Amino acid sequence: MIKRFIIIVALLTTVASAAQEGTSSPYSFYGIGLTKFKGTVENQSMGGIRMFSDSIHLNLRNPGSYGRLKLTTFTVGGSHQSTALKTDNDSESSRTTSLDYLAIGLPTGRLNFGVGLIPFTAVGYRILENNDETSNRYTGRGGMNKVFLTAGYSVNDNLSLGVDVNYNFGNIQNNFTTLQRGVQLGSRQINRTDLRGFNLNFGLDYQRKLNDNLKLYTVATYAPQMDITTERMRNIATLSFRTDGSEVVIEENDISFPQGDLSLPSEITLGAGIGTNNKWFMGAEYSRISASDYNFNSGNSFAEVQYDNASQYRLGGFYIPEYNSLTSYFSRVVYRAGLRFEETGLNLSNEGINEFGISFGVGLPAGRSFTNANLGIEYGQRGTTNSGLIQENFFKLSISLSLNDKWFVQRKFD
């Protein structure tokens, strides 16, 4: 199984290398970029909810779920997204492909562990602004990733607690080039920010039987506000342009800024749901993010930008016709659906940037073990055309593999 896992990771990494920015959203222009979904395809296909956990799947959104893990589990996931962007006067389209997560969970008894890599934010935009006097071009790339170590402890059959220790790292580059009409030379400004530092996320997973058929699921997670280190540099250059549009640097100057801090906002999530083992589940969650405490300066300075506290509302679930059917493969398939609404906290020209998504997915049994492939689709909308802003309509196709095995087995010899 390990060899299969390595081959799969290599293939997905090769595919994802075609577009590692992970986004083409103009809204990634602001702050440290667009926040990436931090969860598995299984989570995403149910509106992003984090409360459901079992013994054979990793739940990257709730460290408390690791206490229920019974098998060593590898999971890897990637996605392809098509986006249509429009304003009141124009429209464009874009596509991105990315590797979304890579993780392993290791059960050792009541105390279980996990380790993995997942994107935190992504920057990827290209904006052209032309008028009678100037021609401006804004481009950006990069983002922040996190390596995480998770520990989850099963207190009893009902309660499990856990913590994520995340090391965040990455860099963001924002470029601005301007050329004035009738002037031979132009100017370019490159702002690069390197980011690194730790943050924590605590999770509680509580499940209890209500009767012989129904089970109650509840979840609570909390990530406290923590600071990470930033190092910023600026390159200012005078340019000339060849006939093919390429740049020639005439003169340039590097400016270094003092080391600073970025406050990652606190986040709290509460959720509850009900279901029947191996049959169906439905749940709802609410998250509150203190984005108004955000204090990052990337070199992009706009008076009409501010951050408000963010909220997320999620609803989702799954249905399995007959999980142990011997005659029908599709009766053993897990059918998932969900929806979400997010107030992102980003406020431009007094317009809050909101996001909506509706998702569907399937979990496909593969082989004799608990190994499964997961497919998910999401259609969503971000932003608005009000106040001269941009509305994005996106379609996302996600795929993941979850491979299970049993390690640390004491072998018996005759």
Feature map (PLM): residue ranges:
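N-terminal signal peptide c-region/cleavage motif recognized by signal peptidases
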Residues: 13-16
